[in-house]
Amino acid sequence: MVWLEPPLLLPIFFLASHVGAAVDLTLLADLRLTEPQRFFLTCVSGEAGAGRGSDAWGPPLLLEKDDRIVRTPRPWQPPHIARNGSSRVTVRGFSQPSDLVGVFSCVGGGGTRVLYVHNSPGAHLLPDKVTHTVNKGDTAVLSARVRKEKQTDVIWKSNGSYFYTLDRHEAQDGQFLLQLPNVQPSSSGIYSATYLEASPLGSAFFRLIVRGCEAGRWGQDCTKECPGCLHGGVCHDQDGECVCPPGFTGTRCEQACREGRFGQSCQEQCPGTSGCRGLTFCLPDPYGCSCGSGWRGSQCQEACAPGRFGADCHLQCQCQNGGTCDRFSGCVCPSGWHGMHCEKSDRIPQILDMVSELEFNLDTMPRINCAAAGNPFPVRGSMELRKPDGTVLLSTKAIVEPDRTTAEFEVPRLALGDSGLWECRVSTSGGQDSRRFRINVKVPPVPLTAPRLLAKQSRQLVVSPLVSFSGDGPIASVRLHYRPQDSTMAWSTIVVDPSENVTLMNLRPKTGYSVRVQLSRPGEGGEGAWGPPTLMTTDCPEPLLKPWLEGWHVEGPDRLRVSWSLPPVPGPLVGDGFLLRLWDGARGQERRENVSSPQARTALLTGLTPGTYYQLDVRLYHCTLLGPASPAARVLLPPSGPPAPRHLHAQALSDSEIQLMWQRPEAAAGPISKYIVEVQVAGGSGDPLWMDVDRPEETSTIVRGLNASTRYLFRVRASVQGPGDWSNVVEQSTLGNGLQIEGPVQEIHAAEEGLDQQLVLAVVGSVSATCLTILAALLTLACIRKSCLHRRRTFTYQSGSGEETILQFSSGTLTLTRRPKPQPEPLNYPVLEWEDITFEDLIGEGNFGQVIRAMIKKDGLKMNAAIKMLKEYASENDHRDFAGELEVLCKLGHHPNIINLLGACENRGYLYIAIEYAPYGNLLDFLRKSRVLETDPAFAREHGTASTLSSRQLLRFASDAANGMQYLSEKQFIHRDLAARNVLVGENLASKIADFGLSRGEEVYVKKTMGRLPVRWMAIESLNYSVYTTKSDVWSFGVLLWEIVSLGGTPYCGMTCAELYEKLPQAYRMEQPRNCDDEVYELMRQCWRDRPYERPPFAQIALQLGRMLEARKAYVNMSLFENFTYAGIDATAEEA
């Protein structure tokens, strides 16, 4: 039950129910039960789909009590509302008699409102008749009967305001009369008669309905003639249809329902066994309220007097030719006679079973049948069909049956002007009869806008077919036609649901497709013309080949040469080049190298960091699409070596020996493992010879096996974990007999066999030492990795309450052991088995984490999911925030506007969190991709729009986010990083709050640690004092709303963070976007108020945005108005 407050406007009483008389809506009041607890009101709709509550069918049935005129105390206990199916709602269980006095209404489809006025049975004055329906210009007389006389004057009010006063001596036969001459539609409303100084509950309440035309007329200018409604039916002043009283039906209310039935098709039945006794029926205006057929009296419990029938027993039978009067249906004629008064003989022809209304589509040529009986029997030439303009159509065929003749008329192609009342006439020697019926010519729907492209892949297009259209509904089917651009091949067609996005499958890559929508309504010829075309282009074909790394080698301290290969493939290679990725896990840095030639199989990477372990992979790319990555390899770039040895000099000892001497390098980073000596013949063309000095404490060596009388060049370098810089080059000649032989040292053999053996031993020793060094390094790395794995299974983090917490994973639980407390607190989470996760594509990654799309199996069902995981070298702080996010997700529970937890899995000491997969990515990128003036200017100018998203869709994003934040605030969680980048777009374009890594579960959170801050989204108190509350999130929501309206613009674009710190406390705020409605901008300003307690709560924000959605107003203007420009984007500023 809805109670309308006094401040609302009054004209709803006499205007709202004029929305459409054709609506089958009835409000019943049970007057048999005088106790408030047993009294009930029932609202019944006979419309198809009534009360389903969707956009297609309108709002659900609603029962309201209006206290704006008859103000009564609020009930101490609200009445009970019960719904029986989708087309009936009942309210009962009122607390006290005063709860019943006043105006009740039933609101149905299309906003049609039916009113009922209830008078107190114990009032001083009672109305002789509650509802009065009169014509424009008539004189209305309202009669208040005295039940309990008072010696005071009587005040008449109209719509709660003083209208007239009658002296107490002006009563006539115990009645006070109010005459209203020459009434107009503005005279309609609620009237009341009250003794002076008496309680309003003792008043007599009336409802006056004034038709907009004079008697027998209807239409905007009241020039059309009413059809002549029978049995007390009232002609609607707007569309000329008869509003039939309860118990009668038909175009002119000519047919009586069976006893106890009502509704436009007699489909409803009165409750109980006593028929419709004691029930008041209220119908759409201009009918009003009355008793059911066969009953009269203030409580509708008195049967009609003999000779009377119908609603309120207003009709007289006046039966002829032996007919008898039935108080429910009128005259019951004997055999051989028919008509309202049994005045027509059966010899007179009679139209049989003629429907009251038909509907056809424009430009169709339907066949209409008309059946008649009589004596003599009607033949084809005796029947004709008349159009509204008077044109006469003759039947083309007649089917004669024992009890009737059915004539078939072929109607020429229908035009809009053919809508109206048609008439079937039959004429024989026994007389004539006619029956009028209405034909409605409907215009097939035609789309006004083209479908919208939401996402694209190489072989798929995601399309939103929801379009505005001209013509008539309802929409029976939506067809999507598409084919390649400039193609002569046949169109492909699929039937789609207009409320859901559709994916066009099996398309050709990098191909433009023309896409059009066709709408259809029910009936033959209901297919409308195709809507305007739009061009949608598929993405490039994704590369499918997976490269593999052939090898790599270090070419310098910061240079790495990488080579790879591809599997053989027939035909041309699909790809534009290769992307090499080097991931430095220790520093959280990624290096990407683009090789622009698809024929390249090697690349030199420079500028690397010595002494770093890199994870290396390579993948093929085509356009913007990446192929599968090669198996990753772990590459160590040796650390930079020590400085060069000092003061190198050489001395010839013999014709085959030279001694080298040097000093240790200065500030070597670690113990020197060996020295490396380079020997080369001066001026020779051969490669140099290297030899190792494996005893690092020695700073001299003798080079043997040299050629006599030959000049040599020498240099030395030291090695710690890798070789260092070379020393200066020195030159020295061996002793000899004057002969000088040039050539590679490796090609000259020493004369003495012992010297050769010493050189071989030196080389073997050097190789052995190197192998031992590599083995020791591998063992050390294995120990370090084992230690890291152990550390990741159990570690500590600082929780939101400030307590140091130990996290331990086990099957299905995350144990948070807070050190000040002796007992652990296990946090349960839905368990996913490692075998039930199939990893697919990398969605995104940051410095320390990755998000991978995966297919998971949960409760026996396969579903898409996004798997969040930390990288191998994430810090303990990262593990802390990651586990904290799982804790937040577990405590939050499920809500349609947040990214919900699907489960978690622990494998080999690593935690994997599975959350809902959002197929359209984050809201920021989604908004920026919709800037169609930048991506497709021709489309934008052709359709006059700046975005592929409508105003309603943008407002829906904001409403969804507000609902999600309301849920977080009710759970007492503070997000702290609310922005469009942290809102994801899920199925049906629903926005979902995401990224709870910074969320906290306190009412106030004070940040005590350092870290990068989202300054442009932060509230003043957060910037100045590092204090975060739900009201701080409200500030951020205002910035998010600005991002949505600006299609992903950068907040405060062009300003530095330092300027923000200075200007925000000085009341500076972002300006109103030109495409933004004042109401939306005012909501932003409310979120940006200086004092947190003055900002609206999320519940109020969600309610306000919900009302904007229901208003269906373009709050965000996406039209290309003059000098339209998008809000600026500064990616570097968004990082701060």
UniProtKB/Swiss-Prot annotation:
Extracellular side: 24-757
Catalytic activity line of the entry: L-tyrosyl-[protein] + ATP = O-phospho-L-tyrosyl-[protein] + ADP + H(+)
Disulfide-bond pairs as recorded: C226-C235, C229-C242, C244-C253, C317-C325, C319-C331, C333-C342
Pfam families named among the record's database cross-references: fn3 (PF00041), ig (PF00047), PK_Tyr_Ser-Thr (PF07714)
Cytoplasmic side: 783-1136
Binding annotation for ATP: I843, G844, E845, G846, N847, F848, G849, Q850, V851, K868
PTM: Phosphorylated on tyrosine residues in response to ANGPT1, most likely by TEK/TIE2.
Cellular component, GO annotation: plasma membrane; receptor complex
GO MF, one annotated term: ATP binding
Keywords in alphabetical order: Angiogenesis, ATP-binding, Cell membrane, Disulfide bond, EGF-like domain, Glycoprotein, Immunoglobulin domain, Kinase, Membrane, Nucleotide-binding, Phosphoprotein, Receptor, Repeat, Signal, Transferase, Transmembrane, Transmembrane helix, Tyrosine-protein kinase
Entry keyword annotation includes Iron-sulfur: no
Glycosylation sites: N84, N159, N501, N594, N707
Signal sequence annotation: 1-23
Ranges of residues in domain Ig-like C2-type: 43-106, 370-424
Protein name, as recorded: Tyrosine-protein kinase receptor Tie-1
Gene symbol of the encoding locus: TIE1
